[in-house]
């Protein structure tokens, strides 16, 4: 409990410090797609209607289940983390009000990432969630995980992109995406010519299904990881 208090205070101070002292805050612009509820561009959208149902890599996220004791423990942890998240959120929103509209979008996106990290911590970490959510084989290893957004026709959806030795897998509260490595065709970084701050990663399967991911905290690291995974999958197919 002391560790949680210490962590919350440290993160809160760090957020307030960065907001107050960031030199380029007046020139910072955030992609509206990441924080608005308007539909994403059609060419970067995963349809949520008939097209999504026909996509073999997409499924609805299952309802979470757990035994009584684990659920009780997790609910207790979530309660503590939830209160912490609200305190951080209140502090950030106050700072946002002082900083002006320019900081509105990045702050909300940052709060979204904090909420996602809080949820992951409360549920036992990325490795545990990955193995509970997706079917895995004994020798499969989780190599990387990235909090990001998946572009859909209903708007960007926040979740986690998992990179393992066998698949790419994306998990949100509403959707699951699973692409075996041997089904990967290409991984393409894409940067908006109008606003270079808008960066995407396009993933294409061998049967030409497209997925657009955005809002990475470490964009370059995500691109490198996904491209390395694509090459590894190609090597396995050749062998």
From Swiss-Prot:
Belongs to the GEM family. It holds the Pfam family GRAM. The lineage of its organism: Eukaryota, Viridiplantae, Streptophyta, Embryophyta, Tracheophyta. Residues 29-68 are annotated as: Disordered. InterPro entries: GEM-like, GRAM, PH-like_dom_sf. This is Putative GEM-like protein 3. Residues 128-191 form the GRAM domain. It comes from Arabidopsis thaliana (Mouse-ear cress). Signal peptide: none annotated.
